[in-house]
């Protein structure tokens, strides 16, 4: 199939997905993007969000919390800090991720009191993490 690309989703713990897909919706740090066959070469960082693949075998959804994606004309590789199939995410999992983001914000405020950049980044991470829960209806 000329309309498919090789897709790989890897987290530090395991390979979550590998196969041919027609499209991948990626929660990029600069906004959501859809990558398909013949996409221009791109590397983007991920924000917490829902990564969705579409392919011959149907649609798959994964919650990711960060990392990066490398996109070429023939492949899409996502290296995620944390990735969990959406169907496996529990409220307790999400609550733990939000708590971790809240703690990171507190630490950023303490360490960078007069530097808004790192504090803003941590606040955005927390907001994105909360939005993930709203998006997947936990």
From Swiss-Prot:
GO terms for molecular function: ATP binding; proton-transporting ATP synthase activity, rotational mechanism. SUPFAM superfamilies: Epsilon subunit of F1F0-ATP synthase N-terminal domain (SSF51344). Keywords: ATP synthesis, Cell inner membrane, Cell membrane, CF(1), Hydrogen ion transport, Ion transport, Membrane, Transport. GO terms for cellular component: plasma membrane; proton-transporting ATP synthase complex. It is a peripheral membrane protein. It holds the Pfam family ATP-synt_DE_N. It comes from the Bacteria. InterPro entries: ATP_synth_F1_dsu/esu (IPR001469), ATP_synth_F1_dsu/esu_N (IPR020546), ATPsynth_dsu/esu_N (IPR036771). It is found in: Cell inner membrane. Its main location: membrane. Belongs to the ATPase epsilon chain family. Produces ATP from ADP in the presence of a proton gradient across the membrane. F-type ATPases have 2 components, CF(1) - the catalytic core - and CF(0) - the membrane proton channel. CF(1) has five subunits: alpha(3), beta(3), gamma(1), delta(1), epsilon(1). CF(0) has three main subunits: a, b and c. PANTHER family: ATP SYNTHASE DELTA/EPSILON CHAIN, ATP SYNTHASE EPSILON CHAIN, CHLOROPLASTIC. This is ATP synthase epsilon chain.
């Amino acid at each position: 199939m000329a309309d498919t690309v090789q897709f790989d989703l890897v987290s530090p713990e395991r390979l979550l997905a590998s196969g041919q897909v027609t499209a991948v919706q990626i929660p990029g740090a600069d906004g959501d993007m859809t990558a398909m066959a013949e996409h221009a070469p791109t590397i983007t960082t991920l924000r917490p969000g829902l990564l969705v693949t579409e392919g011959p075998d149907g649609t798959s959804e994964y919650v990711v919390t960060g990392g990066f994606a490398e996109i070429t004309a023939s492949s899409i590789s996502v290296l995620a800090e944390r990735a969990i199939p959406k169907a496996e995410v529990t409220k307790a999992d999400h609550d733990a991720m939000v708590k971790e983001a809240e703690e990171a914000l507190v630490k950023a405020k303490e360490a960078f009191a007069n530097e808004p950049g790192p504090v803003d980044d941590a606040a955005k991470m927390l907001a994105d993490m909360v939005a993930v829960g709203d998006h997947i209806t936990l």
